[in-house]
Amino acid sequence: MNNQTNQQSQTQSQSQQRINFDITGWEKKSKLSTQQYLLINNLNKSTQEKPLPQKYLEDKINNDIKKEENQQLQQQQQQQQQQQQQQQSPIIENFMDNFNPKTDIDNLSDFYQWYSIIDKNNPHLHQYEWFLETIVNYSKGSNQLLSMVENCDKLVESIQTDYSNLTKKTNQLNEDCEKFFNEELKLRYIAQSIHDKLKFYNQLEIQTKKFNTTNFNVTDSTFLTSLENLENSINFMKSNSTFMESNKYLTQYGFIFSRALGLIKDYISSNLKILSRDIINAQKQLKTSVSTPTSPQLQSSSGGSPLINDFSNSTDFNDLFQHSNIRFRAFAPKLRPLCLELEKRAIGPYLSYLYDTQNIYFNNRRSILSLIMFEKLQSLSKMTDISSMIRSSSLFMIQFYENEYQIYSNFFSPPDLNNNNNNNNNNNNNDNINNSTNINNSNNTNNNNQDIINNCPAFSNILDEYSQQLYDTIRPIYIHIHSFETLCNLAHLIRNELIDDLVQKSMKYSNGFKMTIERMLQDIQERLIFIIQTYIRDEIRSYHPNSDDLDYPNKLKIYVTAESTAVDGDGNGSGNSSPTLSYKSIYSTWYPTLEKSLTCLSKLYLVLETRIFEGLAQEVVEACTFTLIQASRLLLIQQKNDPYIILDSQLFLIKNLLTLREQIAPFDINFVIIEKIVDFPNLKHSLSTLYNVGSFLTLSTNNPILSLLSPRVTNTSIDSKKDLEKELKQSIESFILSNANTIIDPLLSLLTKISVFLNQSNKNQTDPMLLSQQSFADPQRIKEIIEQVKEKASNYLPQVIDRMKLYLSISTQILLMKPIRTNIIDSFDQINQYTKKYYTEDQIKIIDLQSLKLILDKILTPSKQSNNNNNNNNNNNNNNNNNNNNNNNNNNNNNNNNNNNNKNENNENENENNSNVNSPSPQQL
């Protein structure tokens, strides 16, 4: 019974569990169908879409349509779901119908009966039981899994908590380690820094002991290292002046550093003195060996100082000079490192050690070279040719400069003397001395140090001394020269050879040689100006000609004869004609003052400044013109018996003035000087008005006191070239008028009488036709006068033409003869006009005026042969003039020839264009 009871209780419990199972809830928990998922997705998409803008309204309408379609699909899906539920609901209803008893259960049999009915009617409930059991098992497993997950979660949380705690502790440990490591590094750096800084403090005792010992000197192997340590210590103390007792240590280090540099200076000084003493002793031995009585050459020399005898020949000088150079070059590698150490540290007060060392070096070189230089310059000063002496001396000085530069470069850094400025160096030194410990502490200091090393004033000073010695040796020689040609050659040599060539080579060593050469040039130019002014006064303006100087036209005839002989000799192939003879011949035709003036100008043109040359050229041209005029007058006085002396005098003046004008044309200068003259008459008037007391009170220019305090000064310009043109024009006009009047003088008197008669007839109102009845105007009388004119023209004009051929060129002859012919023809034209107006045809035939023109044309028109001869003579004259220019002015050959050719061409053109001018201008000639 108990078993049955248990079974019934179990059965009831199972039935209760079945009754409590809600199948509707399970259906709700079941998965959705595919259509349902699609519907949900469509709804999700529609909710995720953002509203469109107003401008896309049409798209929105389309979307609404799509929404309606989706709603329809949803309704269809809902209907399908309802149908499915309806399919399932009969099972549930049937189950519920079976489950609910139709009759009441009163006893156990009713229960079993009801149960059997349920069991029969619902056979598929076993499947649900199995499924329920499975679900229950899954639920238990899930619960167990959840409990395990919870345990794992708790375990993970505990692990995470432990890990975070461990991480914090590890990070803290790492930070602490890094902190301790950084502190360790910092302490080590501080310790090392302290050690490094203490090293400079500890060096003081070490260096003090080292430099105080007697065994420590410059030759010690550790000397340079100690010097660098001292320099580093000084730089450290200077850059860390805030450290304790840094100034004290800086001062002590400075004393030790100065002592070290002093040791270097003393060592170099002692070695250089020993070297110089050995070289001087060697020179004395060589001097003694050369000066022994066994040398006949030296026995004849004059006595004097034992160190200054005649051993200045080239062999002795070269031996001494080369011996000293070789010894210094061989000794340089020993001292050069120490000299470079001084140059590196030549800053502030330590610059004096470098300067002292350089001065010691130059003093030793000076003691060796003084005797050698003196003897060499004395030997050069004994040369007879001053130009060769100056050239040789300059070449020697350039070689000497180069040699000294190379020797100096073997000891010290090579100086760059092109940028040498002693004043700037002195200023830099004073600024640096104020800073007692400034050693290599900035880039600017390094630059200044390099500038000081490159700019060596002592090197320039010693070269300047020897340049001054050269100047003192040569100046007494050229200052006593009285020949201006020699002075011109010297000035030309200095300007064109020495300054342009040698001086440029010496500029990289010293400016002293350039200054010396320029001083020499200035002295020579000053001496030359003085000599030229004396020469102008004594040799040109005050020149007194002798009889040979005024032997004209014989000098010209001799020249023409010599030229014709030379031409004939060339034509016969003899080849005996000499160009030098031709040059001397053309010079012999010039008046001496003309030759001297042109020689003076050509020499001065290239050696003086333009401003100075213009003033001297004006004086020379004015003096030469004056002497030519005086010579033409003396020619008239000395040769009174010559009937053609007036003609010779005029042609002499024209020829020489033309030559002077032609020869000064190539000089591109202004022959004008401006003189300031005080108006002394005005001063005299002011002094005379001082007695008028009332005039003192006038506030005007008439006040005598104001006139005395501010005298009137007038500027007067003197143009010698214009004066020359004026004199030339006057001489040409005088020549033309005198020669024309000489021929037509009777005709001119006749014309004067005719003009007087016609004027009287006009006043008296008489018949002018009575002119032919006058005794002075009788046709026969006029014919006699014309015959006289013809005779003079036939006799006098050929003489004039012959003289002109001697003096002038063919082009100048034509220019001068045209106005003479024109004046003669004009006078005859006036007679012809009078005869046509006041004479009958028969009377005109008696007078016969046309024959005079034929005679003039025959006389004044030269033949072809004479033209050829004159052209040859003219060409020879031009060539000789050009050669004269070449000899007198070496650098203006092309200019003179071109100017002469241009002048001849211009003269020919002007001759053609001015054939109707009565008197030609000087420019036409």
Swiss-Prot record:
Subunit structure: Component of the conserved oligomeric Golgi complex which is composed of eight different subunits and is required for normal Golgi morphology and localization.
Disulphide-bridged cysteine pairs: none
Membrane topology of the entry: Peripheral membrane protein
Main location: Golgi
UniProt similarity note: Belongs to the COG3 family.
Any single GO CC term annotated in Swiss-Prot or TrEMBL for this entry: Golgi membrane
Name of the protein described by the UniProt record: Conserved oligomeric Golgi complex subunit 3
Coiled-coil boundaries: none
Stretch list, region Disordered: 68-88, 416-446, 863-925
Subcellular localization, as worded in the UniProt entry: Golgi apparatus membrane
Source organism of this protein record: Dictyostelium discoideum
